[in-house]
Amino acid sequence: MQHYETVEAVTFAYGQHHHLEIQITREIAKEQGIRHHILDMSLLGQITAQPDFATIHISYIPDKLCVESKSLKLYLFSYRNHGDFHENCINTIGKDLVNLLDPRYLEVWGKFTPRGGISIDPYYNYGKQGTKYEGLAEQRLFQHDLYPEKIDNR
C-alpha cells in the first residue's frame, strides 16, 4: 500500500443478512488506516421479507381441463411467504398453470403495489403451439399495456 498515494476501501451494502461482514471490513480498514466507504445498494431489489401486495389477473381458454377456484386460491395463497421477484412469481404461476391445465390460451398479469415509487406489473401469456391461440398470444403480448390504465389505488 505504500506504493500508492491513497488507498480507499469500498463495501457494497446490498441487504446481506450478515451485517457482521460490513463491521469486520470497517474494522480492518480502520486498522490499516484506509478510508472506508459503504455504498447502500438496497435499491437493486433486495428481498426484504416485507410483504408485497398484488392483484393477480388470470384469464384462460381451457382445452379439456379447468382449475377449481378453491384450489387456485390455495395455490396463490402459498405465495404469501414466498420471497422472490415479482416477475419470477408471475412466470412461475403461468408455467404451473400451463403444465397443469394444458390450456388453449392463458395469461397472468400481476399488479403489485409499487416499491420505491416504481410499479412493476409483470405479464405472462401462452398460446398452444400450432393453433390459432399461438398467434393470439403474440398479438396480446404486443398489445399488452399499449394503453395503460389509470391507476389511482396506489
Curated annotation (Swiss-Prot):
Q: Does the keyword NADP apply?
A: yes
Q: What class of enzyme is it?
A: oxidoreductase
Q: In which pathway does it act?
A: tRNA modification; tRNA-queuosine biosynthesis
Main subcellular location of this protein, as a coarse class = cytoplasm
Listed GO CC annotations: cytosol
What GO terms are given for molecular function?
A: preQ1 synthase activity
Reaction equations catalysed: 7-aminomethyl-7-carbaguanine + 2 NADP(+) = 7-cyano-7-deazaguanine + 2 NADPH + 3 H(+)
Signal peptide stretch: none
- EC assignment: the record states 1.7.1.13
Q: Which GO terms describe its biological process?
A: queuosine biosynthetic process; tRNA modification
Q: Would the keyword NADP turn up in this protein's UniProt record?
A: yes
Compartment(s) of residence: Cytoplasm
| Task performed by this protein | Catalyzes the NADPH-dependent reduction of 7-cyano-7-deazaguanine (preQ0) to 7-aminomethyl-7-deazaguanine (preQ1).
Question: Which NCBIfam families does the UniProt entry name for this protein?
Answer: QueF-II
Q: Which family does it belong to?
A: Belongs to the GTP cyclohydrolase I family. QueF type 1 subfamily.
- The protein's name is Putative NADPH-dependent 7-cyano-7-deazaguanine reductase
Q: What is the lineage of its organism?
A: Bacteria, Bacillati, Bacillota, Bacilli, Lactobacillales
What is the primary gene name for this protein? queF
